[in-house]
């Protein structure tokens, strides 16, 4: 497959969540050949205000601190996008926003996490 933009995202597969508690979940996916960074998009099911996070590994822990609120009892949808480029920024959110400049909208299939109530 020929990519016109060398920073264009690649399709991420096998997104899964493990170790789900009321306050956190570990999310992992298959590494993408040539990918050096990933953007994680997540949001509460049925709401439109998705959030972004950035990782340079094929894993991410979503917890109350990252979410900036309580996850207990929520259903959260997670999507991942892979990039060849390593992005810079003041924090993981700024890096994710920088990656979206190269966005070709190649998100993984959804991984839905049902956080148990406390």
Task: Give the ranges of each region predicted by the language model.
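Proline-enriched interdomain boundary motifs that mark the N-terminal boundary
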Residues: 7-17
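Short beta-strand elements
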Residues: 94-118
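Conserved aromatic anchor
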Residues: 23-34
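A recurrent domain-boundary module in secreted/ectodomain proteins
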Residues: 1-7
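Short beta-strand segments within Ig-like beta-sandwich modules, predominantly Fibronectin type-III
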Residues: 51-59
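Extracellular low-complexity, O-glycosylation-prone stalks/linkers
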Residues: 34-52, 79-81
């Amino acid at each position: 497959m020929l990519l016109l933009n060398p920073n264009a995202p690649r399709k991420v597969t096998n997104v899964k969540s493990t170790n789900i508690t009321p306050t956190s979940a570990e999310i992992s996916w298959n590494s993408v050949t040539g990918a050096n960074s990933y953007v994680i998009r997540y949001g509460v099911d049925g709401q439109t205000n998705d959030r972004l996070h950035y990782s340079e590994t094929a894993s991410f822990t979503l917890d109350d601190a990252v979410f900036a609120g309580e996850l207990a009892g929520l259903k959260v949808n997670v999507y991942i996008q892979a990039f060849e480029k390593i992005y810079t920024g003041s924090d993981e959110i700024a890096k994710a926003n920088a990656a979206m400049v190269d966005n070709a909208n190649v998100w993984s299939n959804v991984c839905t996490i049902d956080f148990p109530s406390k």
